[in-house]
């Protein structure tokens, strides 16, 4: 059943107008000041640290996100913020899910699965890597795609009470 869900899952339909708005080539870094071009935002994302890096965490453009993810000063906490951001551009979330450094972090994977903008096929691939306690939370979460919730429900049921107690440290 689970294999069939993964093979037949398709990415959620996103509001095209919202994605177009988020992918504008120019956008202000803060609520004030002139809009920065995509090139300027990408250049700022390469800098080691600073206020601009914190502001860029809210930039949904996949090109900016890709550069941010490679920034050695970026912390897991900041990547979790990127993964949990809503609304989000699905392509940017895919970059987080596939990044060699960040895709192994349980907190990042959890944030991606709980983000309804994460493409279904990506969320299904990640949900099996989470804990039984997370599976129960995902199964009950509103706003997530039905295949993701069903997968978590099935995994949670198969885990049984003993494995769930182990996962939560009881």
Q: What residue ranges belong to the model's regions?
A:
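Alpha-helical scaffold segments
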Residues: 1-170
């Amino acid at each position: 059943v689970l294999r069939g869900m993964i093979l037949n899952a398709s990415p959620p339909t996103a509001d095209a107008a919202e994605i177009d708005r988020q992918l504008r080539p120019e956008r202000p870094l803060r609520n004030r000041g002139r809009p920065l071009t995509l090139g300027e935002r990408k250049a700022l994302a390469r800098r080691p640290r600073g206020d601009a890096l914190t502001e860029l965490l809210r930039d949904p453009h996949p090109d900016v996100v890709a550069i941010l993810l490679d920034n050695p000063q970026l912390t897991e906490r900041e990547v979790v913020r990127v993964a949990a951001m809503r609304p989000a551009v699905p392509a940017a979330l895919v970059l987080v899910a596939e990044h060699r450094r960040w895709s192994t972090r349980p907190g990042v994977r959890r944030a991606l699965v709980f983000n309804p903008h994460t493409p279904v096929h990506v969320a299904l691939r990640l949900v099996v890597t989470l804990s039984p306690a997370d599976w129960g939370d995902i199964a009950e979460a509103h706003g997530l795609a039905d295949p993701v919730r069903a997968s978590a429900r099935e995994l949670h049921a198969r885990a049984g009470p003993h494995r769930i107690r182990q996962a939560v440290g009881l």
